[in-house]
């Protein structure tokens, strides 16, 4: 209780600040702020959306599932979708989730009915380097610990459905009387686990004798990279989910015939495991506004957006939906606009580009140890990265707003420089102080977004037609979005292209797997590199999700932990109170 009173007192002080710099919040951590909040019962949050108690499936007092029958496509088309993305980030991230939540609070404060719709966090980054995905400071979704950990079990369901298919594949190979004659050397399907564990990237299974299966090479991806996760995020209803699960491409028989999950009669059992996971999750922000959180693919190795069902649920129940797409705009936003919006017929009316002075210093050549030292020259040099992202958003026929996510180390000169440079490009740039002030710190950003949505919004357009040739789609992204001069294809990628053509998958969307640290496929090329060539190493097939995954450079779909993982700083006491989670 004392902490709660102190937190509210401290917040009142912070809300009176009007300077560019944000003063320290007495070292209160994100989790301490979240734990000090007295949450509203989830029934009251649902009522704010016009949803009756009988229409929600409660997971305790503060979490609930929303049934799919609530979705109304007529309302989806009428309401306003705002996408939050960012410039090319530093390893710690630039605060897209924090800005998304803060913007939602700000929109509600200026009289707009707004809901934030986000992805679910993965345990890999939570215990790794990047931390959770519940926002920060006074712009968080709660209950923060639950959301960042097991939440409502959706990730577990995705993992189990994925690994059920793996078990069915190996069982079929082992079965001597009733098998599909699958050639183990051609199996493309991998197991998954929601953890950063590099030791599982390449493994051998089936050892220990004939009773333990047929030995073969296998490996693990992280759960957000699972095609089951991609399917969950692309499904339009439960029947569509089941069909997509059946369409998963596994490999070939010894007769070189393709094998799909439906050939193993796997889709119904997989769908059974996902029967609850398909429903979006309802929670709340610190200011008791609705938050829908559902699905969790990464943007560098998957499509990086929440589910179509969650976005449509939000647009059914609110006039404004604020959503985000992972990493920089070259990854998450590109996929949101070329894949998700194109397929689901969504029309985002504004894009908020999150920038930080820290990231601009980084792209100006500053080393990590000097990220927090004012350096106007570096910010000036690094601005070209932000400028390229602005140009890219405009290629989709959408007008961006730049949100400068404020840090205590920002100088007035640096902030004013960025605002003036954006203004010279005809872009409205606004200081976003949601981390320190919640909705009070984002009202100006909210007004800038509303101005675009209500006065300047146009019909967005994707950069490519899904029916275009595969190489043309890849090269459109590489050249138009990344700024590459050339695209090269390895021998493996060329073999993959022939396989794709033979299987009739040419009309699928393109979901690039690329480093998030650069526009290029070389993470060392910061800023705005030019004249570079990207190399397509291989192209994976996600037939159920209906996209192809060109893997650029050295990207891997199972991350590893850093030398000092975040888990080392976490504790839990005898009463179950967690600290160190962020």
Question: What are the roles of these predicted feature ranges?
Answer:
Residues 22-582:
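Flexible phosphate-sensing "switch/lid" loops adjacent to ATP/NTP-binding sites
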Residues 14-18, 194-195:
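Intrinsically disordered, low-complexity serine/threonine-rich segments
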Residues 9-15, 114, 318:
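Generic secretory/membrane-interface signal
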Residues 9-12, 19-21, 576:
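Charged/polar low-complexity intrinsically disordered segments
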């Amino acid at each position: 209780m004392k902490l709660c009173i102190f937190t509210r007192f401290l917040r009142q002080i912070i809300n009176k600040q009007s300077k560019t710099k944000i003063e320290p919040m007495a070292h209160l951590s994100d989790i301490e702020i979240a734990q000090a909040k007295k949450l509203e019962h989830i029934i009251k949050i649902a009522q704010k959306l016009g949803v009756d108690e009988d229409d929600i499936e409660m997971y305790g007092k503060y979490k609930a599932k929303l049934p799919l029958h609530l979705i109304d496509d007529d309302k989806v088309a009428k309401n306003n979708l705002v996408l939050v993305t960012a410039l090319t980030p530093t390893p710690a991230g630039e605060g897209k989730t924090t800005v998304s939540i803060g913007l939602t609070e700000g929109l509600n404060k200026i009289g707009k009915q707004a809901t934030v719709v986000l992805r679910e966090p993965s345990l890999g980054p939570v215990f790794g380097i990047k931390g959770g995905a519940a926002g920060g400071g006074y712009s968080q979704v709660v209950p923060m610990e639950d959301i960042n950990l097991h939440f409502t079990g959706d990730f577990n369901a995705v993992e189990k459905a994925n690994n059920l298919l793996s078990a069915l594949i190996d069982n079929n190979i082992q079965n001597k009387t009733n098998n599909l004659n699958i050639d183990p050397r051609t199996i493309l399907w991998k197991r998954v686990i929601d953890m950063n564990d590099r030791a599982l990237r390449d493994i051998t299974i089936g050892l220990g004798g004939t009773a333990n299966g047929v030995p073969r090479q296998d490996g693990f991806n992280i759960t957000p990279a699972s095609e089951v996760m991609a399917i969950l995020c692309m499904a339009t209803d439960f029947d569509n989910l089941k069909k997509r699960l059946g369409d998963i491409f596994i490999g070939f028989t010894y007769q070189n015939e393709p094998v799909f999950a439906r050939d193993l009669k796997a889709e119904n059992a997989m769908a059974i495991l996902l029967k609850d996971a398909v429903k979006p999750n309802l929670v709340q922000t610190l200011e008791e506004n609705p938050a829908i959180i559902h699905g969790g693919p990464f943007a560098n190795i998957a499509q990086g957006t929440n589910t179509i069902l969650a976005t449509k649920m939000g647009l059914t129940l609110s006039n404004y939906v604020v959503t985000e797409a992972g990493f920089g705009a070259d990854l998450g936003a590109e996929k949101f606009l070329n894949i998700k919006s194109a397929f689901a017929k969504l029309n985002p009316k504004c894009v908020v580009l999150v920038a930080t002075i820290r990231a601009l210093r980084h792209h100006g050549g500053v080393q990590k140890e000097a990220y927090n030292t004012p350096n106007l020259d570096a910010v000036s040099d690094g601005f070209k990265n932000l400028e390229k992202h602005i140009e890219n958003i405009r290629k989709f026929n959408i007008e961006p707003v730049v949100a400068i996510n404020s840090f205590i180390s920002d100088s007035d000169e640096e902030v004013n420089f960025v605002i003036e440079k954006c203004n010279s490009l005809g872009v409205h740039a606004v200081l976003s102080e949601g981390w320190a002030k919640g909705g009070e710190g984002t009202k100006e950003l909210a007004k800038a977004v509303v101005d675009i949505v209500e006065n300047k919004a146009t019909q967005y357009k994707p950069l490519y037609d899904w029916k275009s040739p595969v190489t043309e789609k890849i090269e459109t992204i590489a050249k138009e979005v990344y700024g590459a001069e050339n695209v090269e294809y390895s021998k493996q990628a060329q073999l993959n292209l022939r396989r794709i053509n033979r299987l009739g998958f040419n009309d699928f969307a393109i979901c690039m797997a690329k480093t998030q640290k650069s526009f290029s496929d070389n993470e060392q090329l910061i800023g705005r590199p030019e004249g570079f060539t990207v190399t397509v190493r291989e192209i994976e097939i996600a037939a159920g999700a209906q996209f192809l995954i060109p893997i650029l450079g050295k990207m891997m779909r199972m991350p590893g932990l850093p030398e000092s993982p975040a888990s080392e700083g976490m504790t839990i006491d005898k009463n179950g109170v967690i600290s160190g989670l962020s």
